[in-house]
Every structure is written in C-alpha cells, then in structure tokens.
Design a protein with these regions (language model features):
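Extreme N-terminal starter segment of soluble prokaryotic enzymes
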Residues: 2-5
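Low-complexity, highly charged intrinsically disordered N-terminal segments
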Residues: 7-22
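Active-site rim helix/loop that mediates acceptor-substrate recognition in acyltransferases
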Residues: 24-71, 181-202
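Conserved beta-strand in the GNAT
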Residues: 50-52, 58-68, 79-86, 211-226
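Short coil/turn motifs at secondary-structure junctions
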Residues: 68-70, 90, 123-125, 221
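Conserved acetyl-CoA-binding loop-helix of GNAT-fold acetyltransferases
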Residues: 84-87, 93-106
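Conserved active-site alpha-helix within GNAT-family acetyltransferase domains
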Residues: 110-114, 119-138
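Amide-forming acyltransferase catalytic core, primarily the GNAT-like/NAT-type
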Residues: 136-227
Length: 227
C-alpha cells in the first residue's frame, strides 16, 4: 500500500481535525480547534506545523511540531513543542508514529532548535531522546489564608472577562506579558488564542477608576489561575 510523509496545509484542516478528534475521542471527547485554538487554525502557517503519513491519500497518523520563541532576559531560545501525536487504531504498530517523530526531531536539529518539550508517556518518548526535567510550582490560596494575611481588608479591584474583540485591553495584556523577564514571543492574534486554549478564560483587573492594572487567566471552572 502506497504511503507518503507530508507536511499539511490549510486545505487539510478539516480532514486533519476530523482524524485527530476521532483518535483522541476514543479515550475522552476532544475537539482540537476548540481546545487549542493557539495551535490549530485553517491557515497554511499553522497547519504547516503538522506532519502526516498518508495511505492512498488518506491521513493515518499525525505529529505536530510547534515553534516557540522563549525570551530569557536578553537571550532568545528557539524551541519546538510536540503535540497532537495520533495514529489510526487500525494502524497501531505500523511504525508511523516513529517515522513522524524521527522526522520532526531531525528537522529540529537541522533548524538549530535549542530545545524541545512535550507531555506524554515517559517510556514512549524516551525512544526519541525525551526525558523528564524541570520543576513546576503550584500555589494553593484560600479565603482563610487571605484573612490571616490581610485581615478584613477589602480589595477595590474588579475583574472583567476579556472579550476577544477588545483590542485595547488585549494590547494592555500583551504589554504586561512582554514586560516580564521570561516570556514567550507571540503575535497579537496568537496571544489571544493562547489565553483561551485548554478552555481557559482571561480576565482583566480594573482599578476603581476603570484603569487596567493587570490580567489573569483562569481555568474553565474558575478555581485555578494558570497565568
């Protein structure tokens, strides 16, 4: 059976999303354009981050290699994030994932990427040079914590949802984000998509006079702040 490894384009958006949604929904209902709008849009640039194996023209496996520019003070780190790794159930064991992963890792070396990251099963991705690293911090804060730390002090800040059409406050969020010594470089449009990925919800913090003084990104249930 004829197979080919191809770079996807905007023309492949619907077929690729249908395929990936089908594969991932076998374990949990998944809609990639809704879940990760920062990565999946029907244009050539973003779809070109995805590579696929086709059999007789039909997609049977996909791996995404997504560019990330990480600013560390005055140093810029070029990264690639691996995601959307999927193989059709009837083609498990055919070697398509290995073929695509090897291709993406080889391209990273050719393009001079400094590092790559992914989330997934440790042993599965160890074959391609990935290993656990780094430290993540999670802070838990309750009303009781606040009462003991600040007493009955009342905050005069208010939080309003950031509307996708609110370009003024979006620009303010980007300015605050880019002022951090460590941050990712993002276009304005992709910045908004990033805030809303993983079903998260962005909010702007407003002073009593209406001035924007900050922003945060909460998860869909509103009980965790991710940014």
């Amino acid at each position: 059976m004829a197979t080919e490894l191809v770079q996807l384009s905007a023309d492949d958006f619907e077929d690729a999303m249908d395929f990936m949604n089908l594969v991932f929904s076998a374990s949990s209902p998944t809609n990639f354009p809704q879940l990760l709008p920062a990565l999946y849009q029907p244009n050539d640039e973003m779809m070109g981050w995805n590579w696929a194996v086709r059999e007789s023209g039909r997609i049977h496996a996909v791996v995404g290699s997504f560019p990330i520019e990480w600013q560390l003070g005055e140093i810029r780190i070029e990264m690639s994030g691996i995601g959307g790794v999927s193989s059709h159930l009837r083609r498990r064991g055919a070697g398509y994932m290995r073929q695509l992963m090897n291709h993406c890792v080889e391209r990273m070396h050719d393009e001079g990427k400094h590092l790559s990251w992914l989330g997934g099963q440790r042993q599965r991705y160890a074959y391609f040079g990935y290993e656990k690293c780094g430290v993540g911090h999670t802070f838990n804060l309750s009303k009781t914590n606040l009462r003991h730390a600040y007493g009955d002090t009342t905050s005069h800040l208010s939080f309003e949802p950031l509307d996708a059409t609110d370009l003024t406050h979006r620009a303010g969020c980007i300015e605050l984000h880019d002022a951090q010594p460590y941050h990712c470089q993002r276009t304005a449009e992709r910045f908004d998509f990033q805030l809303r990925s993983w079903k998260n919800r962005p909010y702007v913090a407003l002073a009593p006079d209406g001035r924007m003084v900050g922003y945060l990104v909460a998860n869909s249930s509103g009980d965790s702040v991710t940014e």
